[in-house]
C-alpha cells in the first residue's frame, strides 16, 4: 500500500495513502500504548446483555468524555487480549470500535472508527473465508463463519474527521465483526441454529480469562 506524499494534506489523525485509506500500520506500539495508558479497563458485556442486541447511537460529540471512552476501550481490549472491541462490549451504546489487529501478512493495524459503514463490494471482490471466529462477548467459544476476505469501512476517526479503512484476511474479518456489533449483531447471530447452540455450549462449559459483566 502506497504511503501518502509528504505534501499531501489530510485533516485526519492518521496519514492516508494515495487511494485515501488510512495508514494505520505505522507507530502502532506507541499509539496503542498512549491510548491504553490513559484508559481504565472495564469488564466485558456478554451475549444476553441488552446493549449488545440493539443498534448503537451515532457518535456526535467527540469531546473529552468520548476521548476517555476510547482510551478505556483500548485498555479493556488489552486486558481481554482482543484484537477489536466495540463500545457496547463495555456497556456503552455508541457507534465506535477500536482495533489492534494483524492482517494475514502479519502487518499490525491500530485505529479507531466511529459511525462505521461497510462498503458493499462487487461480487468479484467477495472471496469468502470460512475461518474460525470468536468474540470477547461470547467468551471461550469459536465457530467457522464465512466472511469476505477483504473489507472496506467508511466512518469517522476519533476527532470526527472522515476516514476510510481497508483490510485483508484476519483484519478484514475484524472490521466486519466490529461493525456488526454496533448494529446489534454478534457473530453467533450469523451461524446456523446448531452452530449457535454449540457456541453457547462452549461458553457455558468454560470460564472467561477476563472480567465480564454478569447478566441478570
Swiss-Prot record:
Pfam families registered for this protein in UniProt? Pep_deformylase
GO molecular function list: metal ion binding; peptide deformylase activity
The record, for Gene3D superfamilies, names:
Peptide deformylase
The catalytic activity of this protein is classed by the Enzyme Commission as 3.5.1.88
Where along the chain is Fe cation bound?
135, 177, 181
Catalytic reaction equation(s): N-terminal N-formyl-L-methionyl-[peptide] + H2O = N-terminal L-methionyl-[peptide] + formate
What keywords are annotated for this sequence in UniProt?
A: Hydrolase, Iron, Metal-binding, Protein biosynthesis
Instruction: Write down the required cofactor(s).
Output: Fe(2+)
Quote the InterPro entries the UniProt record gives: Peptide_deformylase, Peptide_deformylase_sf
Q: Where is the active site?
A: 178
- Give me the comment on cofactor binding: Binds 1 Fe(2+) ion.
Gene Ontology biological process terms from the UniProt entry: co-translational protein modification; translation
Similarity remark: Belongs to the polypeptide deformylase family.
Q: What does this protein do?
A: Removes the formyl group from the N-terminal Met of newly synthesized proteins. Requires at least a dipeptide for an efficient rate of reaction. N-terminal L-methionine is a prerequisite for activity but the enzyme has broad specificity at other positions.
This chain belongs to the protein called Peptide deformylase 4
What organism does the record attribute this protein to? Streptomyces coelicolor (strain ATCC BAA-471 / A3(2) / M145)
Give the gene name. def4
Amino acid at each position: 500500500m502506497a504511503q501518502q506524499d509528504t505534501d499531501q494534506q489530510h485533516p485526519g489523525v492518521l496519514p492516508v495513502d494515495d487511494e485515501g485509506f488510512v495508514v494505520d500500520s505505522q507507530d502502532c506500539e506507541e499509539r496503542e500504548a498512549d491510548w491504553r495508558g490513559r484508559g481504565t479497563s472495564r469488564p466485558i458485556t456478554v451475549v444476553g446483555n441488552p446493549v449488545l442486541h440493539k443498534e448503537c447511537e451515532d457518535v456526535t460529540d467527540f469531546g473529552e468524555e468520548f476521548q476517555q471512552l476510547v482510551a478505556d476501550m483500548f485498555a479493556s481490549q488489552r486486558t481481554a487480549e482482543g484484537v477489536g472491541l466495540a463500545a457496547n462490549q463495555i456497556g456503552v451504546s455508541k457507534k465506535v470500535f477500536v482495533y489492534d489487529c494483524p492482517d494475514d501478512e502479519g502487518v499490525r493495524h491500530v485505529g479507531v472508527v466511529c459511525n462505521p459503514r461497510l462498503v458493499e463490494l462487487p461480487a468479484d471482490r467477495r472471496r469468502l473465508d470460512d475461518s474460525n471466529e470468536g468474540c470477547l462477548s461470547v467468551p471461550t467459544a469459536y465457530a467457522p463463519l464465512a466472511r469476505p476476505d477483504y473489507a472496506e469501512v467508511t466512518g469517522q476517526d476519533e476527532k470526527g474527521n472522515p476516514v476510510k479503512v481497508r483490510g485483508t484476511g484476519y483484519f478484514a474479518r475484524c472490521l466486519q465483526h466490529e461493525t456488526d456489533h454496533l448494529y446489534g449483531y454478534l457473530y453467533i447471530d450469523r451461524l446456523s441454529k446448531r452452530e449457535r447452540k454449540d457456541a453457547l455450549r462452549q461458553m457455558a462449559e468454560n470460564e472467561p480469562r477476563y472480567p465480564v459483566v454478569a447478566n441478570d
